Amino acid sequence: MAGLSGAQIPDGEFTAVVYRLIRNARYAEAVQLLGGELQRSPRSRAGLSLLGYCYYRLQEFALAAECYEQLGQLHPELEQYRLYQAQALYKACLYAEATRVAFLLLDNPAYHSRVLRLQAAIKYSEGDLPGSRSLVEQLPSREGGEESGGENETDGQINLGCLLYKEGQYEAACSKFFAALQASGYQPDLSYNLALAYYSSRQYASALKHIAEIIERGIRQHPELGVGMTTEGIDVRSVGNTLVLHQTALVEAFNLKAAIEYQLRNYEAAQEALTDMPPRAEEELDPVTLHNQALMNMDARPTEGFEKLQFLLQQNPFPPETFGNLLLLYCKYEYFDLAADVLAENAHLIYKFLTPYLYDFLDAVITCQTAPEEAFIKLDGLAGMLTEVLRKLTIQVQEARHNRDDEAIKKAVNEYDETMEKYIPVLMAQAKIYWNLENYPMVEKIFRKSVEFCNDHDVWKLNVAHVLFMQENKYKEAIGFYEPIVKKHYDNILNVSAIVLANLCVSYIMTSQNEEAEELMRKIEKEEEQLSYDDPDKKMYHLCIVNLVIGTLYCAKGNYDFGISRVIKSLEPYNKKLGTDTWYYAKRCFLSLLENMSKHTIMLRDSVIQECVQFLEHCELHGRNIPAVIEQPLEEERMHVGKNTVTYESRQLKALIYEIIGWNI
């Protein structure tokens, strides 16, 4: 049947062939045949009706609406085509046009109930929740005789559940969806609604349970969808955006699973959830999947991530989180001018997609670049408002515990956690203003003011440790904050940031706790050896960075003989230890060494100089494909490919050594 044209079909068989294609869900082929037939008979009711149906099944809703519009004009007495046109326009997110067409059917009692449902759905999608609720509440009394009472009641539960969800009443929404699921039996889309409501109420375990059921049933009933194939590295064809895929709710389930894992900071599991979903070509991806791919691969592929988010912002509709996430990522990567431009160009989106908190936060962060004092005042106002909320919620939690009211405790604790998630970024933005000025005592002062709320928060503890470390006379206090972080992950120590381990080792050394430093380094070495045994080709940088930071410390103290030697040994073997980050630390020490040599403030033995030259030659050999600098993702002027390598920079450093010591190259 593949590639069959109208001319090849025997006389009298055309209709049978088209219906066979539709029965087998081969809608694209049916569209080809029908398109050719309609060129010969453009007013064919059967042809237009089947073409509209096929377009609808292919989710080409705008094209389906055009077919039904033509049918409505050709056969105005058949109002069902207006209803189909309105439904297709709604699916195409053309809400104003859908409302206009649906309004024409309101006076027909046969369609009244379905039109009310459609109007309620349109208002829901437009964000008019009171209008949608008003229409939903009319439905039960209007539907008498059209459907069985059980189905009618289930639909009512689902509709109210959706409204409650949009209104932020997630627990109540869960109850409605759960009741509907019990009444109707398993339905993938309804099970997904329940999982989404659980997710929004932070009941991740319950959400994952329903997601697992959707995935298991999808795999069992439709193995042809290729779930998990991409993750396993199997090259598979796109399954397309078929009706079957839509009915399984697999795409929605995997996206929600990715979001939960991302929230729980299980970033690898989040990425795996996205690759586990049925394979589709990039141009076939839905907006939510595209948004999540951009977000979860941002660290590895930031340029691609920005392109996807910018593309989504031009679509209608786009995931509501897109606008805020793009602005936050611009600020994270310090593209403050771009963030300001996007805000200015999309002023109409601010009220709809940014909460007052997020807008005020972004405004303050962008202001930091030109008026840090003004920005600090804005952030201080925001912090003051949030601390007031935190105090009130603390009292509510205490009162609820006193009254043994579990529901009130749960509600207050959830609100407290949500407020804390807003407060921490504001606090860090305030601290960053003084951090950039290297005014570390002021940063410490800001953190001390927040100890009442943040003393158990990992991000706060980590940054307190960093600011104490940077003051150079508070290593003992820094240990008090670094140690709990490291001990928390001691069994999987490579999950701890290398710089945290390095700073803790330096703090131990600076407080004469050399045994503790050595023990920690042995632990890291043992973990890396085990990992190397399991995956011999994997590069590991933790111990290398620890040694580099220790070497840097000795260089900073003027002990270049020992410091440079430590730096050189830390990068052996070069094929596993040399990378962009490790080269960054190493070259800083060499540049400091060369600066002091050129000023004649230090003298090095010939053997040390020879060791330096040999080291740079090794880096030259192994660094051909290693970038010396990771370029910013949106830079207009890209660095020269040949110059942005460890090889090129190591040659430059070697040439400088020869020039300073007067050797001939």
Swiss-Prot record:
Coiled coil start-end: 508-535
Assigned keywords, A-Z: Cell projection, Cilium, Cilium biogenesis/degradation, Coiled coil, Repeat, TPR repeat
Region annotated Disordered, chain positions: 130-154
PROSITE patterns: TPR_REGION (PS50293)
Main localization, broad class: other
InterPro entries tied to this protein: TPR-like_helical_dom_sf, TPR_rpt, TT30
Record's keyword annotation contains Repeat: yes
Gene Ontology cellular-component annotations: axonemal microtubule; ciliary tip; cilium; intraciliary transport particle B
Extent of the TPR repeats: 11-44, 45-78, 154-187, 189-221, 393-424, 425-457, 459-492, 544-577
Signal peptide: none
Protein's cellular compartments: Cell projection, Cilium
Gene Ontology terms, MF aspect: intraciliary transport particle B binding
Matches recorded under SMART domains: TPR
GO biological process: cilium assembly; intraciliary anterograde transport; intraciliary transport
Function of the molecule: Required for polyglutamylation of axonemal tubulin. Plays a role in anterograde intraflagellar transport (IFT), the process by which cilia precursors are transported from the base of the cilium to the site of their incorporation at the tip.
The protein's assembly and partners: Interacts with the IFT B complex components IFT27, IFT46, IFT74, IFT52, IFT57, IFT80, IFT81 and IFT88. Interacts with KIF17.
Family, similarity comment: Belongs to the TTC30/dfy-1/fleer family.
Name under which the protein is recorded: Intraflagellar transport protein 70B
